[in-house]
Amino acid sequence: MGKSQKKTAKGRLDKWYKLAKEQGYRSRAAFKLVQLNQKYSFLEKAKVIIDLCAAPGGWLQVASKTCKPGSLIVGVDLAPIKPIPNCHTFVEDITSDKCRSQLRGYLKTWKADVVLHDGAPNVGSAWLQDAYGQAQLVLMSMKLACEFLVAGGTFVTKVFRSRDYNNLLWVFKQLFNKVEATKPPSSRNVSAEIFVVCRGYKAPKKLDPRFTDPRTVFEEVQEPVTNVDAKVFHPEKRKRSREGYADDDYTLHKTVLASEFVTANDPIQILGTSAEIVFPKDDEECQRLYNLDVTTEEILLCCSDLQVLGKKEFRDILRWRLKIRDEMGIGKKVEDEQKTVVEEIPEMDEEERLDQELQDLSEAERVKLKRERRKANQRKQREIVRMQMGMLAPMDIGLEHEAMGEDSLFGLATAEKHGLKELENGTLPVTESVDEEVSTDNEVEYDSDDERDRLEADLDSMYSDYTKRKAESDVKYRVKKARGDLDDEEWNGIDNGTESDDSQIAETNFATPDKDRLTTSLLDKGSTKDGLSRKARMFFDQDIFDGIEDADADVEIMSMNRAAIKKREAELASQNNDDGSKGDQSEDSNDHIEVVPVASAHDEDDDWNSDSDNDENNVEIVTAEAMTLAQDIASRRKSKADLIDEGYNRWSFQSKEGLPDWFLDEETTVNKPNKPITKEAVLALREKMKALNARPIKKVLEAQGRKKMRTIKRLQRVAKKAEGISESGDMTESEKAKEISRLVSRATKSKPKAKPTLVVAKGPNKGLKSRPKGVKGKYKMVDSRMKKDLRAQKRLAKKGRR
């Protein structure tokens, strides 16, 4: 009787099968996970693991042995799984919602670090269907993993190599940072399985449902339609098909009748797909084409093999076809005679004709008024923009001469003629428009001052928002803007307040009200009474500046009074030297002069002098120009008069009132005096910066201060002890002196630094990476090589001294 032999299909009973039996694993697939973990190391750091399609539980056994104690491991499958230590299992379909709810019950608020999937459908004889089913199962497992994976998590799955493999890889790469495909050694070579390890889950806030839709992921891409024109007009670029025969077409040599080619509407399609144009003898139409004069031997030779023809031959065949169609009258359109229909218009009576003319005139007038209104609105819009941009007088292109016409702002005669209401209503343009072409689409009306003010405020707010955003992002611009705000105040001359009251009265008597004047100052209109801009006025309106404003006003009044007193004293001194007649005149002229009582200015002078001294002491030289000027003054190359003369230049009295901020920001970079600098000033400033940079840092200064304080406290304690010793009566004077000197020497003597212990690297200490046994404190590993090097260095140093 023969011995029964156990079947080993596909070599299933290999060494991995035997090793699984020896080590207690439930399946040989456990070694696949072991080898994957050895390569990528994703199980050691995982605290929560989900195993999909986990039966019979080989991967759960590996996870239980490899993960940290206390890790949460959950397995799910359609088949029941026998209990495994430290693992939770349940029976459910991974594509169902019930499976998701049970997983949430196990995980609570946790997220999984690793999701494993080693599932496959029941494989039969239909390989294509089984491969698609496995790819669909992988897609469902990935959908479940994306729901429970933590950011940066790992997903390991098994995939069959098929036509859908590349589509799955593309989806994985969209959701994970690193995607690698590998085949562990324990996987059979005859198997089509391959394992994909996806690491670094991106955790998008919202997952596109098309990534988990099998119909979208595995949709077949339609192949591009063959370009037949390229085969005819570019035969040298023709590519041979390497994908076999077309569907339902198993012939390579295609023929077409000459009559069909001539009468066809798409001859290029026929030339690109056919191999020969034939003239059969049993076809009368083809024989008639064959006997024509245009059908030459060359044409017949070209029609015999279309696959080897070039561009010139194809064009000859197409010309031959056109000639035949012209001779046979094929394709000519029958032109019907156009019949002109004459429509009789009934005659109109007198009333209807008048009504029609009135309607036409009113329509023409309406169109004319609409065109004029559109031009006026467009002109107003352009003028408002020019006023905002400061372009009232374009001097660079000579338009100021055109603007001096009868409709200009400075045409006073025209303004008087038409009245002030024309100016108030805005019908009189500020400057003559250069371009009268207007857009028919945009009609903007600004009939009130409120609209113009609103537009101006919007433009100012837009530019201020831009500067704020730039200041937030650029620190240098913020510092530059802060410095520029300090320099915005311009000097308007000395105002001592000593003008005659008579002149003021005369000015008030002869001055006309602003509402009756034709020419007004546009700059004074936009400025405030104190000369501050709108943004500065809003800043200084805060409550914190209430007291400061009054103090500044008091100081200004005091300075004006002091200047008036000095001038009054000078006038009185000059009057005493004049004769009597002049004295009488002076008495008459002084009748209306208000005499200001003299206050004690001693305290005020002291205050001003103290402030000036503080200002002079706080001046710092931080630029090369300032250093050059300081050196010139110190070396007496420049005097005070020279500096005053240099102060009179074209930048001294520039008016910034009424100019937009964007223009001022651009002008400050170029419109400034270029002061010379010297090499010595640059070097001196550089040395100053080096000295500043050479200062110790804050931590070093603090450490030095702490050390100094400790020394002071220690000396204070020694002084107290010495005082106690000196006051004691039990010791002699010599003993007191010795004890005090001993205390002082002990307090001032610094502790010597402990030298590191030398440990020779030999014996048990050879190649030691940690602290040697029995060694405390600092230590240093030495060997014979270092000893020889030290001796050599000493020898060379001694030789160099000689």
UniProtKB/Swiss-Prot annotation:
Protein's cellular compartments: Nucleus, Nucleolus
Residue ranges with Basic residues bias: 768-779, 793-802
Region (Disordered): 423-451, 487-513, 569-591, 718-802
GO terms for MF: rRNA (guanine) methyltransferase activity; rRNA (guanosine-2'-O-)-methyltransferase activity; rRNA (uridine-2'-O-)-methyltransferase activity
GO cellular component: nucleolus; nucleus; preribosome; preribosome, large subunit precursor
Transmembrane segments: none
BP-aspect Gene Ontology terms: assembly of large subunit precursor of preribosome; maturation of 5.8S rRNA from tricistronic rRNA transcript (SSU-rRNA, 5.8S rRNA, LSU-rRNA); maturation of LSU-rRNA from tricistronic rRNA transcript (SSU-rRNA, 5.8S rRNA, LSU-rRNA); rRNA methylation
Leading EC class: transferase
EC number: 2.1.1.-
Coiled coil: 347-389
Basic and acidic residues bias locations: 579-591, 780-792
Composition-biased stretches (Acidic residues): 433-450, 487-504
Keyword check for Thylakoid: no
Modification type Phosphoserine: residues: S362
Keyword list, A-Z: Coiled coil, Methyltransferase, Nucleus, Phosphoprotein, Ribosome biogenesis, rRNA processing, S-adenosyl-L-methionine, Transferase
Catalytic activity: a ribonucleotide in rRNA + S-adenosyl-L-methionine = a 2'-O-methylribonucleotide in rRNA + S-adenosyl-L-homocysteine + H(+)
Active site: K158 (proton acceptor)
Tree of life domain: Eukaryota
Binding site for S-adenosyl-L-methionine: G57, W59, D77, D93, D118
Subunit structure comment from the entry: Component of the nucleolar and nucleoplasmic pre-60S ribosomal particle.
Record family assignment: Belongs to the class I-like SAM-binding methyltransferase superfamily. RNA methyltransferase RlmE family. SPB1 subfamily.
The protein's name: AdoMet-dependent rRNA methyltransferase spb1
Organism listed in the record: Schizosaccharomyces pombe (strain 972 / ATCC 24843) (Fission yeast)
Classification lineage: Eukaryota, Fungi, Dikarya, Ascomycota, Taphrinomycotina
